[in-house]
Design a protein with these regions (language model features):
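FNR/FR-type flavoprotein reductase catalytic core
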Residues: 1-41, 108, 113-166
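Ferredoxin-reductase
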Residues: 37-131, 147-148
Length: 166
């Protein structure tokens, strides 16, 4: 791409290539907005089960409706919860750590009510459509073979749960 822009600049002069750079920038930003922010690259899932293991904590099991994401223990995904029976989702993508990865591709997310959207997720019901992006992160990817001591509290326990459950 850089060589193409350099060639266009050399052949047609600065004014034409400036428009090409502006056009390329608009297309790049537009694609990013459509693909990432609007969820075009997201995978469809559905809420299959919901648990409340503690006050203000929701654990939800998401089953894949298509090819599942390949998630390693401790990674996180961006999730957008949509409308379902008795639930009006936020519709925005928010990051959540995966606390369990099942063999069938189902994922468990542990969500603490900290803001408006996560507070609303406390009323989540099975059947709600979810779109997932990711996975992201490399939490303890290259773990040593030696013994480890893990220290965590609150919802920060989530990546450790994924490692324990795997």
């Amino acid at each position: 791409m850089g060589l193409g822009l350099g060639h266009a600049w050399f052949v047609s002069g600065f004014s034409n290539s400036l428009w090409m750079v502006v056009l390329l920038t608009i297309v790049s930003v537009g694609w990013r907005l459509l693909r990432a922010d609007r969820g075009m690259g997201a995978r469809p899932y559905e809420v299959s089960q919901v648990y409340h293991p503690a006050a203000h904590i929701t654990e939800t099991i998401l089953k894949p409706l298509a090819k599942p994401l390949l998630v390693a223990p401790g990674q996180f995904v961006s999730a957008a919860f949509f409308e379902g029976p008795y639930f009006q989702g936020c519709g925005d993508f928010h990051p959540y750590t995966v606390s369990q990865v099942a063999e069938d591709g189902s994922l468990t997310l542990s969500i603490k009510a900290l803001g408006a959207c996560t507070q609303h997720i406390q009323s989540l019901q099975p059947g709600v459509a979810v779109r997932l992006q990711g996975p992201y992160g490399t939490f303890l990817l290259n773990r040593p073979v030696a013994s480890e001591v893990w220290i965590a509290a609150g919802i920060g326990l989530t990546p450790f749960l994924a490692l324990l459950r795997s």
